[in-house]
């Protein structure tokens, strides 16, 4: 009797919106080896970070059998998927992306794509955020994701870390390899841009991202510039463990007066 192999179940989300090229390219490439469910925002929610919608309901629309859009943030999407839509048959893996643009260095703190993966991690599932350092070669990033998923099939990822993957915007054959990296850092953002709306009211635009401050060897910034895929393991415990003793000593100065 032929044994039927159970397909991997993958939840996809993003912050660029349910109709974005990145997430749909990813779904197409992964469909050969996995059952895909997409739950993503109904519009672009880039920069939403880990925000949740708390003071209004989430409006969910079914677009296709396995595609739902949510009038909410990327975190809302994953929260809804795991706590309602798929609660009786949870996915094996969560992938957020393919993001339209890089998520490098401290960009990760603002990224809705990284936040979607983080929410999956919070809820106990292995999670990957994948971004294209550009807006052209989404197939390259999808092939990178496919290779990572195949690795997961051989040796499943643990839920201890979120993988933040950044893929150079080039043909797959032009990639110069892979490297595990640490996050780099930028200077603070550029100045606000003051403008006037059609009604004569003063408005402000956020300035562009700051210049790279820490982009040396071993950082994600450095590696993608070398046409290599950057994979950074992220942890969600923000505790500065190496500072616990120092802060305890600092507080004792006040209590000893």
Curated annotation (Swiss-Prot):
Signal peptide: none
Keyword Cell membrane (UniProt): no
Catalysed conversion reaction: a ribonucleoside 5'-phosphate + H2O = a ribonucleoside + phosphate
Pfam families named among the record's database cross-references: SurE
Residues annotated to bind a divalent metal cation: 15-16, 46, 99
GO cellular component terms, semicolon-separated: cytoplasm
Localization, UniProt: Cytoplasm
Domain of life of the organism encoding this protein: Bacteria
Keywords assigned: Cytoplasm, Hydrolase, Metal-binding, Nucleotide-binding
HAMAP family the record matches: SurE (MF_00060)
Main function: Nucleotidase that shows phosphatase activity on nucleoside 5'-monophosphates.
Name of the featured protein: 5'-nucleotidase SurE
Origin species: Aliivibrio fischeri (strain ATCC 700601 / ES114) (Vibrio fischeri)
The gene coding this protein: surE
């Amino acid at each position: 009797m032929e044994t039927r192999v159970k397909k991997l179940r993958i939840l996809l989300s993003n912050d660029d919106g349910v109709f974005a090229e990145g997430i749909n390219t990813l779904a197409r490439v992964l469909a050969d080896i996995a059952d895909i469910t997409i739950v993503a925002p109904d519009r672009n929610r880039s920069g939403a970070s880990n925000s949740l919608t708390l003071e209004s309901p989430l409006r969910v629309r079914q677009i296709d059998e396995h595609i739902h859009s949510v009038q909410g943030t990327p975190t809302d999407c994953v929260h809804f998927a795991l706590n309602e839509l798929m609660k009786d048959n949870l996915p094996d893996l969560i992938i957020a992306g393919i993001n339209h643009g890089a998520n490098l260095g401290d960009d990760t703190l603002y990224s809705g794509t990284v936040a979607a993966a983080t929410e999956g991690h919070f809820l106990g599932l292995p999670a990957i955020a994948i971004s294209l350092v550009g807006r052209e070669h989404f197939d390259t990033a999808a092939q990178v994701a496919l290779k990572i998923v195949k690795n997961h099939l051989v040796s499943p990822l643990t839920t201890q870390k979120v993988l933040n993957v950044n893929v150079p915007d080039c043909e797959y054959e032009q990639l110069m390899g892979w490297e595990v990296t640490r996050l780099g850092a930028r200077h603070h953002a550029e100045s606000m841009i003051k403008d006037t709306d059609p009604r004569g009211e003063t408005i402000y635009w956020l300035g562009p991202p700051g210049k790279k401050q820490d982009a040396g060897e071993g950082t994600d910034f450095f590696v993608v510039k070398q046409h290599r895929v950057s994979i950074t393991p992220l942890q969600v415990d923000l505790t500065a463990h190496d500072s616990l003793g120092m802060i305890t000593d600092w507080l004792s100065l006040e209590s000893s007066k």
